[in-house]
């Protein structure tokens, strides 16, 4: 065996040795670094990066002299009570980043008491969606683009709540509600030049609590999540950080990411004088314009 061959065989073990113990990581940015050590450059490139500019322009306006010894992070969506307004986003092909894939995500999320939105099935044509609904499904999550006629047909075919992802304008949100959707995910899906949290206030004002608003897009800290709650979101979907945790540590990494975000959210709520997520309103934040 040549020296080069021996080094190549040892490379995965050497990489694993460079990973910091998962319990010592303090935020999702460090988890991203661990994922980079674990994955090939091409694989890591698929899930790397974020756009933090919009979050940096939002600051908190805390309330003082409020007793926050007892915090309640729970939130209710579509008749179900959730431990925190932090959900695992639909993630396609997680086994690309870890051999345990979806199983590890489910295990890690369960340990963190977090809800997982099932993986997307992008190969199902719209005309077949109504016949492809799993019997155990509680909510249908659909990703734009879609035709209004198809959405109306699906609405007539099922009594399940329908949530659409990919809404970025107040007009699109109102149109979706008119077509019978029960929830909206504000998402810059395939439109990276637009920040989800930047359009959240206008959509929240237009929707006016007719349906719950969920949101995704570069959420990396508990403070990011609290900003979204204050601006009108009911919950936040976490995608890439979950994949970072999965890639680096499997189920334990997924658990760590979600529990870190939950802990950060609780801390930031207490610092702002908030006892429940429902108390977060626009009065608790300030948006600094460009």
What do the PLM-derived regions correspond to, one by one?
Residues 202, 247-265:
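C-terminal helical cap(s) of enzyme catalytic domains, especially alpha/beta-barrels
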Residues 19-82, 278-281, 286-290:
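An N-cap/entry alpha-helix motif that binds or orients negatively charged groups
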Residues 40, 88, 109, 154, ...:
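Conserved, mostly hydrophobic/aromatic
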Residues 1-12:
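N-terminal secretory signal peptides and thylakoid transit peptides that target proteins
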Residues 131, 144-215, 226-227, 231-234, ...:
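Alpha/beta enzyme core
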Residues 111-130, 135-141:
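A gly/proline- and charged-residue-enriched helix-loop-helix capping module
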Residues 83-121:
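Glycine-rich active-site/cofactor-binding loop and its immediate structural neighborhood
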